[in-house]
Amino acid sequence: MRPLKADLKKIYLFNPSEKSKSQKTVEIIQNILFKNRFNRDDCLIAFGGGITGDVAAYSASTYKRGIKFVNIPTTLLAQVDSSVGGKTGINNSYGKNLIGSFYQPDAVVSDINLLKSLNTREIICGYAEILKSSLLDSYQ
């Protein structure tokens, strides 16, 4: 087994905002994949919150009709919701999440140690999603 570092081809950092959740960001990511000759056996890895996961998952799902994808969510909300739901989406001028696909990640790595850096608001958002899911599940 080769060390992971030997297999890393490119790291792309972007500001995770609603503005960057766009076709432009997807195009940048996919151009990096093309430039580095990613094929269907290669894997795109997302490390970040929900926006990062959405953009990366959509990029993976539409690049060469789908490549492997691993999500490493760094927020509680992403760990309990968007990283495991299989819905990917980006925004356009008509609204949020109007372009997307259904694409389950090949793996999700949820490390609770990543949550230590979150502010109170981020933690509350995650707990609110947990509560919402619990209430909906118990109602059904």
Describe every region a protein language model picked out.
Residues M1-C43, K132:
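ATP/NTP phosphate-donor binding region
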Residues L13, A46-G48, N71, V109:
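Short beta-strand segments
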Residues S17-K19, I45, K68, D106:
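Residue-level marker of motif borders
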Residues K19-Q23, G53-D54, S117:
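Loop/helix-junction capping segments adjacent to catalytic residues or to phosphate/diphosphate-binding pockets
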Residues R37-L44, K96-F102:
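Short, basic, helix/turn surface patches
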Residues D42-S61:
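Glycine/serine-rich anion-binding loops at beta->alpha junctions
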Residues A57-Q140:
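A glycine/threonine-rich phosphate-anchoring loop and its flanking beta-alpha core
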